[in-house]
Amino acid sequence: MIERTFIAENVSETLIDEYFKGKLVRAGYSHLELKKTPIGTRITVFAEKPGFVIGRKGKMVKELTDTLTEVYKVENPQIEVKPLETPDLDPAIVGHKIAASLEKGMHFRKTAHSAVRRVMAAGAKGVAIIISGKLSGERSRTEKFMDGYMKHCGEPAEELVIKSHQLAKLKLGIVGVTVKIMRPDVSLPDEIIILSGEIKEVTEFSEVSQE
């Protein structure tokens, strides 16, 4: 019973996340956090432009609340909106901007290189942008753009790298955009930290008793 409830809650959160992605495009929607409370369900929405989530006179947030109640059967939803501190370190925001630029006709290489520079300028330890699909011809291909340090496999890649997948609808077809970012605050298992300061030589003597 507990397992079924857990699965149902995760499915519900995934569906709500997909709904927000489509509804809050202009707001620069990133992700949500859902938490059950004694008085209902608190949903924290993280977005680049919180004002668009709230809407004029609270119209948008009311629409979201009504949909959560009626369609997704969320008990007494309380929506809280929080701004992103550094949008260029959020893979969902970066990926969305790349997809939007591609849909406007910008060249994929110029768009990707520009995004890489912004992410690294924001302080990331590393970034990888992968664009796949029909980019300039009939044949599909994959282009990768990377800078800095990046873990691609194993436990560090799962725990230290945040990623997002976005889609761009072009005339030639659907193009996938994957963004992976290693944030500046992560500590790598094999990272060596050198502390600055004066190095003092210490010599110790010990007496050896002779019997």
From Swiss-Prot:
Cross-referenced SUPFAM superfamilies: Prokaryotic type KH domain (KH-domain type II), Ribosomal protein S3 C-terminal domain
InterPro entries referenced in this protein's UniProt entry, alphabetically: KH_dom, KH_dom-like_a/b, KH_dom_type_2, KH_sf_prok-type, Ribosomal_S3_C_sf, Ribosomal_uS3_arc, Ribosomal_uS3_C, Ribosomal_uS3_euk/arc
Record key words, sorted: Ribonucleoprotein, Ribosomal protein, RNA-binding, rRNA-binding
Keyword Cell cycle belongs to the record: no
Family: Belongs to the universal ribosomal protein uS3 family.
Function description: Binds the lower part of the 30S subunit head.
Protein name in UniProt: Small ribosomal subunit protein uS3
Lineage: Archaea, Methanobacteriati, Methanobacteriota, Methanomada group, Methanococci
